Amino acid sequence: MPKIKMIIGLGNIGKEYQDTRHNVGEWFIAKIAQDNNQSFSSNPKLNCNLAKVSIDYNNVVLVFPTTYMNNSGLAVSKVANFYKIAPAEILVVHDELDIDSGEIRLKKGGGHGGHNGLRSINQHLGTNDYLRLRIGIGHPGHKSKVANYVLSNPSIAQKKDIDSAIDNGICFLDDIINYKLEPVMQKLHTK
């Protein structure tokens, strides 16, 4: 059975995007690094900011692509090749429009669902056989509003809900790393 060796936090690079809904994946890995007293260092060769942590006695690389969302797959494939990490050993954490704020879901494989970061990762890895931790940001109501919505900051109440979802996901990280997926899915997916 595989173990997770790399966690990707999707988002856009730059201070202007740091607090936007589209960067909740970055928020997630930043919290992991902070909880483990680690900081990210820039790795231009691998197109990312990188930190290394130990989770439940497993060495895990935290990756924030510096390529912007639409080309995240470039960094993911470079880091995976450099560290010899298989797609099944990758966890991608990203924002999810189709899940309410404050909720979080774990998924194995599947399509990109219109998410450009996932689309890029699927293309660069040549597969969609990796784990995804989907952090709900809610939907603005109409597809014409999506781009502005994901690139804007959440309200104070919504930020609190998203932070709660991140904390909830981190509580289950040991089991996710060790591929104990069914119990995690049952707990995360039950209201």
Swiss-Prot record:
Extent of the signal sequence: none
Catalytic residues in the record: H22
Pfam families in UniProt: Pept_tRNA_hydro
Entry EC no(s): 3.1.1.29
Site (Stabilizes the basic form of H active site to accept a proton): D95
Keyword annotations: Cytoplasm, Hydrolase, RNA-binding, tRNA-binding
Main subcellular location of this protein, as a coarse class: cytoplasm
Record-marked site positions (Discriminates between blocked and unblocked aminoacyl-tRNA): N12
Localization annotation: Cytoplasm
Reaction catalysis annotation: an N-acyl-L-alpha-aminoacyl-tRNA + H2O = an N-acyl-L-amino acid + a tRNA + H(+)
First-tier enzyme category under EC: hydrolase
Residues the record lists as binding tRNA: Y17, Y68, N70, N116
UniProt cross-references to PROSITE patterns, sorted A to Z: PEPT_TRNA_HYDROL_2
Annotated GO biological process: protein quality control for misfolded or incompletely synthesized proteins; rescue of stalled ribosome
InterPro entries: Pept_tRNA_hydro, Pept_tRNA_hydro_CS, Pept_tRNA_hydro_sf
Job description of the protein: Hydrolyzes ribosome-free peptidyl-tRNAs (with 1 or more amino acids incorporated), which drop off the ribosome during protein synthesis, or as a result of ribosome stalling.
HAMAP family per UniProt: Pept_tRNA_hydro_bact (MF_00083)
NCBIfam families named among the record's database cross-references: pth
Subunit text: Monomer.
Family listed: Belongs to the PTH family.
Protein name per UniProt: Peptidyl-tRNA hydrolase
Taxon lineage: Bacteria, Pseudomonadati, Pseudomonadota, Gammaproteobacteria, Thiotrichales
